[in-house]
């Protein structure tokens, strides 16, 4: 830049610069309305929606498009869990279906390779979607240098790129949170990011954390014959789910040989050449657990550091970027969506936030999200799905409610599948019959929830669900039956 004169030209009320933190060269052909930092489910969806609304959009991503969900989380785990379902059926229930599987061989590496092919296909799909909507993709790490200006440090030795836009959206996601004093080595002591890539299952494993990640990996490895112990500091696994749902899943896990230690905070973990012994606190003192490896599945920490937010005065709390219902921060022109806000760290919630944010930027008409009533899903075996209030939460708020529960074992399709453990529970306002919550545990529970969340959003009474004719035989009939139970009486119970 030496010897050059910095030029500045007004372009549609925005300034765009290239190269350097303090100096730049005007790039008249790249004015942006919106720049999104991060191309995960929140970021890339926000960019696409912004482009659909007529904005010139760009994303900055330092890793793979699709974020953690697509590359290391939601998608590859679901691919592996499909393999786990097949393995479980053949090894524990093959005789019921008439299969003789005495010499069955299972290739875990093949399952992992299959999952990576699916990831590659979907990453390419995101790339094509962004290209289709004329969204520019800049590779590298971004810093918000000032409101309206982003500096991108490329991964190679090329000069930094300075971009400008009226609106900057932070969608940088979150990373695994490890307990204090524990540093994963990626081998004996590891997180989901390492676990999802390794082509050999653990010889034995202790999973610290009984939330969605811990339960899904427990389901996977148990199906491949790995001895699994789940260590949860709270009184029950799946602690954010309805108490009865947690109990049903725990019962199923124990039946399959998974050891559950709940109410057992980890006191110490020692990494050795031969394994990773743990000491956990129990009512009677301490207990020692021997495991070949330890998976840390204790939650997430927002990726809000190193973005320049502190210098700009963006309000944060324990790393979470605080936003209002429009996804706006306290600094005009800076927005935040997805896991980095700490609202509800789920991919589909991030995508919904991204759409709402883009619509609010474009016209101020974006949806206001009721996070408590958004769907939650856990793809363990059995699956869990829920939204809204549990019975205990409703009682704590002084709400008068009615509940109905219908079992999958009274459903013809579930019996035909041979997967009939579990039930659906609906919670409704006692006076108006308005749906306040639903909790499902059982086969394909995660696929059944949208009908119920739509009914809630539309303000429909449970009677409308009961009167909605469901195809027979389908698993979804359990929803209709439970709704009948709330509005006049069960038909098949």
For the regions a language model picked out, list residue spans one by one.
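Short hydrophobic core segments
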Residues: 35-37, 142, 162-173, 208, ...
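A Rossmann-like FAD-binding core segment of flavoenzymes
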Residues: 16, 21, 136-139, 143-156, ...
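FAD-site-proximal beta/loop scaffold in flavoenzymes
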Residues: 186-201, 288-363
């Amino acid at each position: 830049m030496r010897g050059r004169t910095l030029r500045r030209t007004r372009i549609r009320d925005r300034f765009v610069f290239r190269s350097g933190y303090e100096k730049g060269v005007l790039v008249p052909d790249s004015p942006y309305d919106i720049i999104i930092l991060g191309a995960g489910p929140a970021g890339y969806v926000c960019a696409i929606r912004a482009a659909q609304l007529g904005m010139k959009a760009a994303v900055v991503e330092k890793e793979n498009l699709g974020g953690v969900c697509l590359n290391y989380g939601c998608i590859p785990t679901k691919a592996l869990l499909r393999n786990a379902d097949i393995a479980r059926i053949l090894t524990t229930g093959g005789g019921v279906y008439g299969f003789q599987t005495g010499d069955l061989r299972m290739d875990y590496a093949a399952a992992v390779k299959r999952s990576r092919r699916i990831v590659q296909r979907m990453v390419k799909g995101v790339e094509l979607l962004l290209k289709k909507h004329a969204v520019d993709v800049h590779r590298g790490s971004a810093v918000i240098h000032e409101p309206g200006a982003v500096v991108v440090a490329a991964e190679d030795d090329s000069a930094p790129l300075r971009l400008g836009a009226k609106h900057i959206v932070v969608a940088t996601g979150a990373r695994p949170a490890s307990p204090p004093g524990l540093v994963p080595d990626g081998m004996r002591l590891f997180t989901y990011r390492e676990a999802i890539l390794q082509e050999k299952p653990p010889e034995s494993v202790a999973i610290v954390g009984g939330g969605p990640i811990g339960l899904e990996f427990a389901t996977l490895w148990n199906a491949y014959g790995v001895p699994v112990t789940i260590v949860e500091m709270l009184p029950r696994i799946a602690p954010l789910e309805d108490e009865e749902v947690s109990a049903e899943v725990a019962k199923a896990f124990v039946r399959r040989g998974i050891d559950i230690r709940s109410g057992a905070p980890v006191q110490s973990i020692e990494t050795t050449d031969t394994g990773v012994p743990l000491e956990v606190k129990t009512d009677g003192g301490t207990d020692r657990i021997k495991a070949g490896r330890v998976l840390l599945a204790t939650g997430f920490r927002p990726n809000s550091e190193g973005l320049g937010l502190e210098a700009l005065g963006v309000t944060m709390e324990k790393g979470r970027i605080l936003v209002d219902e429009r996804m706006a921060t306290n600094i005009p022109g800076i927005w935040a969506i997805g896991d980095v806000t700490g609202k509800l760290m789920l991919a589909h919630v991030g995508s919904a936030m991204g759409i709402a944010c883009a619509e609010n930027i474009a016209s101020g008409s974006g949806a206001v999200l009721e996070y408590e009533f958004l769907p939650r899903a856990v793809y363990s075996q059995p699956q869990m799905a829920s939204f809204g209030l549990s019975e205990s939460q409703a009682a704590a708020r002084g709400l008068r409610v009615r509940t109905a529960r219908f079992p999958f074992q009274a459903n013809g399709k579930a019996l035909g599948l041979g997967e009939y453990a579990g039930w659906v529970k609906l919670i409704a306002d006692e006076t108006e019959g308005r749906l306040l919550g639903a909790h499902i545990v059982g086969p394909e529970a995660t696929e059944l929830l949208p009908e119920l969340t739509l009914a809630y959003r539309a303000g429909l009474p449970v009677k409308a669900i009961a009167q909605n004719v469901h195809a027979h035989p389908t698993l979804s009939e359990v929803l209709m039956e439970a709704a009948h139970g709330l509005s006049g009486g069960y038909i098949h119970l």
